[in-house]
Amino acid sequence: HAFLSKAFADVVEIKGLTIRYVEGRMDRDGTLARNLIAAPSLLADNVAAYYEKVVDFKPHLVMTDFDSFAYLFAKRHGLPIVSVDNQQIITRCKHDDDVKQGVKVDYQLTKAFIRAKLPGCDHYVITTFFEPPVRKKFRETTTLVGPILRGEILKAKRTARTGDHVLVYQTSASSKALLDALNEVSDHRFFVYGMRRKDQKSAPLPDRVGNCFIKDFSEEGFVNDLATCQAVVANGGLSLIGEALYLGKPIFSIPVKNQFEQVMNARYLEKLGYGLGSDVIDAQLLKLFLREREKYAARIVKGHREVGNERLYTIVDSLARRFEKKAKKSEKRGLREA
């Protein structure tokens, strides 16, 4: 909401669920407890927004980025709904056994959750940097597109170069373990983002710890450091992976434990030759990755698919025309008050 409000005047905040992390791992029980406690107030806030803003908006098409409120709104009013997210790739595509090896429980749990969250959308657009085959029964209602990138990243492509630092973005790992490992790689400088948070209770880290330069977050500074780095060390989130690949940066991925989507992304990075994945921050493996970074960079230039922005716009326009009849039926009935 805060990000979109900078670009658009009429943005309504719909609150959602959150994930709790403990020592670099998704805390399943803690996540469940936190969301159960927060659910009543979230529901009240969202219902208020529904009556005050959304009903009067009278949309003809609903798009949801893995958000249940928008999905339920569309179902309630008989509106066409298009899912645009990266999670659906887990259920709607086939994945080789090596992608699921050792994490099959997380895979099954994640798949069940995704299936239950947004069933029966009119179409699913999946953002991804890899292209597994779509399951036969889903082919007519599923489209894969490249990562969707913000304008600042697209502009940074023009000035991107290989500098003398490695960009690190890690919010879930232990700061001590990460910094200790990075300092073992003494022949590189690391620009570290994500370790200074507004809500942190411990004393803030100094500006420099050995060969690690601790950065306060700013969008301009982060994009510049990303565009001029040698390589990226990050978790397995799709957003930064997509941005780094677009700028030609190899990635050393340390996915958050118990989050299958991140593990999957890290393993596909390795399969495609765009970088390495590791369950932990391992200094020796990081040294190997950095020695071979030019090999990974060459693979990215050769194999990475184009950005998905323009293709997404074309697909959405096409879907809007296709579902126009359904939208008109809903408009004739009028939006329901509850």
Regions found by a protein language model. Name each.
Residues L61-D65, N224-M264:
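A donor-sugar binding/catalytic signature common to diverse glycosyltransferases
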Residues K287-A338:
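C-terminal amphipathic helix plus adjacent low-complexity
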Residues E13-I14, F213-F217, G275-A283:
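Short acidic-hydrophobic, aromatic-tinged amphipathic segments that line or gate anion-handling sites
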Residues H77-L144:
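Active-site-proximal region of nucleotide-activated glycan assembly enzymes
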Residues H1-S41:
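Conserved nucleotide-sugar phosphate-binding/catalytic loop shared by glycosyltransferases and other
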Residues D27-L61, S68-F69, V105:
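Conserved nucleotide-sugar donor-binding subdomain of glycosyltransferases
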Residues I148-T228:
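Donor-nucleotide binding loops and adjacent catalytic segments primarily
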Residues V99-K100, S202-L205, P250-Y296:
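Nucleotide-sugar donor-binding patch of glycosyltransferase catalytic domains
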